[in-house]
Amino acid sequence: FFEKESCWVRVDMTDAFCSQLRKKIMASAASLQIPLIDHAVFACSEGPRFESAAEVKMYQMLGADLVGTPVVPEIILAREAGMCYSAIAAIMNLGCGMVESVAHDDMTKYYRSCGAQEKVEKIVRETIRTFVDDRTCRCAGAALEGVAGRFPAWYLEETEP
């Protein structure tokens, strides 16, 4: 952002998700006895649409554990804004080429019938309930670490104490 003011930012996406927030989410899930997998590789495709069988196969070959359309660009915008960000990905379909067909209605019905929606809501509520802002992560400074050029005058005026 800030491109027309001779400043742009390239945020480091090495650790895109906040590890501290992820730990809090994992602790909340554990306290509720809701199993979660701590780490996975998410491949984002352009949506809203389902991936083709060839895309699913390609992402598998590249090492993806999950494929979907959410998370990007949200994670990038959160990094640029200096926000802690994490995601809970509920598996709702196996993907084209892994099952005979994929339909949005089937996916939505499964999400509700298997209890995923309620589980995600419980985890989010518990994370908020037990949240303490004790962050020592680098999320807040992510954008500042990637600055090239000069900040525009309006930005400096808005951020002065």
Briefly describe each language-model feature range.
Residues 1-99, 107-114, 118, 124-132, ...:
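Glycine-rich phosphate- or other oxyanion-binding loops that anchor nucleotides, phosphorylated ligands
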